[in-house]
């Protein structure tokens, strides 16, 4: 039986913290789907196409990881569609745990056959968040230490425009 997992987020943008979780999940599961979720009602910092491109470039070295774009749907529905029996969630701190535990409660109500697996972010990466990265970009500070090269390239393109 193939063990498939789903790791969801907006990845606006993808960070080295996300990649840490993706890499470790790729060792635990036969296939990891990255569910790139977005809501048409909300304006992302990067377009969905750009986020997908940055993610795909960042995960290229992982042969058992792929990106799926999901619009206005529940993670449990996408998990069922791809046959994933596990949600992978990254934890940076206790606030993340509180949020994720609440999310797990509702996911279990909707799909009690899908387990949630928590992976703690590596301590050196735990302060990194997409919202902090967007703030650094806004103030034209370097994001190189915190994000994959694919994001750095997109930020540099934005600066040139």
From Swiss-Prot:
Disulfide bonds: none annotated. It is found in: Cytoplasm. Its EC number is 2.7.7.3. ATP binds at residues 10-11, 18, 90-92, 100, 125-131. Pathway: Cofactor biosynthesis; coenzyme A biosynthesis; CoA from (R)-pantothenate: step 4/5. The record marks 18 as: Transition state stabilizer. InterPro entries: Cyt_trans-like, PPAT, Rossmann-like_a/b/a_fold. Substrate binds at residues 10, 42, 75, 89. Pfam families: CTP_transf_like. Signal peptide: none annotated. It is an enzyme of class 2 (transferase). Keywords: ATP-binding, Coenzyme A biosynthesis, Cytoplasm, Magnesium, Nucleotide-binding, Nucleotidyltransferase, Transferase. One of its GO terms (biological process) is coenzyme A biosynthetic process. One of its GO terms (molecular function) is ATP binding. Its cofactor is Mg(2+). It catalyses: (R)-4'-phosphopantetheine + ATP + H(+) = 3'-dephospho-CoA + diphosphate. Reversibly transfers an adenylyl group from ATP to 4'-phosphopantetheine, yielding dephospho-CoA (dPCoA) and pyrophosphate. Belongs to the bacterial CoaD family. Homohexamer. This is Phosphopantetheine adenylyltransferase. The lineage of its organism: Bacteria, Bacillati, Bacillota, Bacilli, Lactobacillales.
């Amino acid at each position: 039986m193939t063990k498939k997992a789903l790791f969801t987020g907006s990845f606006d943008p993808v960070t080295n913290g996300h990649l840490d979780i993706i890499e470790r999940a790729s060792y635990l599961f036969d296939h990891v789907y990255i569910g790139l979720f977005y809501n048409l009602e909300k304006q992302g910092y990067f377009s969905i196409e750009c986020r997908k491109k940055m993610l795909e470039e960042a995960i290229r070295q992982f042969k058992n990881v792929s990106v799926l774009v999901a619009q206005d749907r529940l993670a449990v529905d996408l998990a069922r569609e791809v046959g994933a029996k596990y949600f992978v969630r990254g934890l940076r701190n206790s606030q993340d745990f509180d949020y994720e535990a609440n999310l797990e409660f509702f996911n279990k109500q909707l799909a009690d056959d899908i387990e949630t697996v928590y992976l703690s972010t590596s301590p050196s990466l735990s302060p990194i968040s997409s919202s902090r990265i967007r703030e650094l970009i806004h103030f034209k500070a370097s994001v190189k230490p915190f994000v994959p090269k694919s994001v750095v390239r997109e930020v540099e393109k934005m600066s040139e425009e």
